[in-house]
Amino acid sequence: MAAPGPRALRAALCGGCCCLLLCAQLVLAGKGARGFGRGALLRLNVWPTTQGGCKHLGHCEHCVDRAHNFSICVWQQCGPEEPGHCVAQAEVVKEGCSIYNHSESCPASHHHSTEEPKPSTTGSPPIPEDHSPGFDGASFIGGIVLVLSLQATAFFVLRFLKAKDSTYQTLI
């Protein structure tokens, strides 16, 4: 079998680049595998493990949000007077407790504290704001512009290299 020619190599390179860009767009758009959403490659979805587990997630929405964890945490509320707390799925006590694992099912917080919040002196990073899932038109247009500019750059680079190869002539 003969070695693949330069056109086959170029086609393979272009196909691989297109697949890579498509995967990047899907991940950034939140269409990837479970646990991968907007910015998941940067955040690496290790929020609970870097912050000391599920117990650091103080709100039901943050506890069960897939952007903050791999759904290993659930919100447990064992009575109307208790505000509830975030626990790992393996630590759930099922007797007389309500378990919430979706942000839509989280109980509405009717309890408002009368105390003023005290300034924190710990060096913990702020919790990132939640972004509503859905179609982001600006990101989509930006992705299209990015892909088209990369394809145009690759086209002109390959055209330049091909033109440079054709100027060589043999002496014989």
Swiss-Prot record:
Highest taxon of the source? Eukaryota
UniProt region (Disordered), positions on chain: 108-132
Instruction: Enumerate the Extracellular topological stretches.
Output: 30-137
Keywords associated with the record: Glycoprotein, Membrane, Signal, Transmembrane, Transmembrane helix
The protein's recorded glycosylation sites are N69, N101
Residue intervals on the Cytoplasmic side: 159-172
| Residue spans crossing the bilayer | 138-158
Gene Ontology CC terms: membrane
Taxonomic lineage of the native organism: Eukaryota, Metazoa, Chordata, Craniata, Vertebrata
* Bilayer disposition of the protein: Single-pass type I membrane protein
Q: Which family does it belong to?
A: Belongs to the CD164 family.
Name its cellular compartments.
Answer: Membrane
Q: Which Pfam families match?
A: MGC-24 (PF05283)
* Signal sequence coordinates: 1-29
Q: What is this protein called?
A: CD164 sialomucin-like 2 protein
Q: Which PANTHER family match?
A: CD164 SIALOMUCIN-LIKE 2 PROTEIN, MUCIN/PORIMIN
